[in-house]
UniProtKB/Swiss-Prot annotation:
Active site: residue positions: 88, 91, 114
Function: Catalyzes the reaction of cyanate with bicarbonate to produce ammonia and carbon dioxide.
Name under which the protein is recorded: Cyanate hydratase
InterPro entries named among the record's database cross-references: Cyanase (IPR008076), Cyanate_lyase_C (IPR003712), Cyanate_lyase_C_sf (IPR036581), CYNS_N (IPR048564), Lambda_DNA-bd_dom_sf (IPR010982)
EC number: 4.2.1.104
Organism in which the protein naturally occurs: Methylibium petroleiphilum (strain ATCC BAA-1232 / LMG 22953 / PM1)
Length: 147
């Protein structure tokens, strides 16, 4: 069994049981955003966390061990995404990426926003013209160093 197969089993079981990521996260004791990323194979769980996830998704000990292995993060295909929702993020970075870069550099200097020392919050924002998706990303600024 591979990590991808474990991820596929998690997703299939989630659908079959009608589970919500927020409910799973509450049982694990972490945010819904981080827990979802972990269950989709992008983060590493502790033994205790893997045990909780394993119980929820009826994973064997061998399958739970895959959840504790450091994954190849960002392992989506390198081609332009075809899923409409993921494509919109690709499009967002294509359109606003240079703006993000300019404004971050203007505010902080030459460096990057960490995706390691990072947190994200996704919420529904009621709006008269139709509900909106509100995503807040917070990453530590890491300046480039001279040497």
């Amino acid at each position: 069994m591979s990590r991808l197969e474990v991820t596929e089993k998690i997703v299939a079981t989630k659908v079959a049981k009608g589970l919500k990521w927020s409910d799973i996260a509450a049982k694990v004791g972490l945010s819904k955003e981080w827990t979802t990323a972990a269950c989709l194979g992008q983060m590493t769980l502790t033994k205790e966390q893997a045990g909780i996830v394993g119980e929820i998704f009826s994973l064997s000990d061998a399958e739970q061990k895959w959840l504790m292995v450091v994954p190849y993060k960002g392992s989506l295909p390198t081609t332009v995404p075809t899923d409409p929702l993921i494509y919109r993020f690709y499009e967002l970075v294509s359109v606003y990426g240079t703006t993000f870069k300019e404004l971050i550099h203007e505010e902080f200097g030459d460096g990057i926003m960490s995706a390691i020392d990072f947190k994200m919050d996704l919420q529904r924002e009621p709006h008269p013209a139709g509900d909106r998706v509100s995503i807040t990303m917070s990453g530590k600024f890491l300046p480039y160093k001279t040497y």
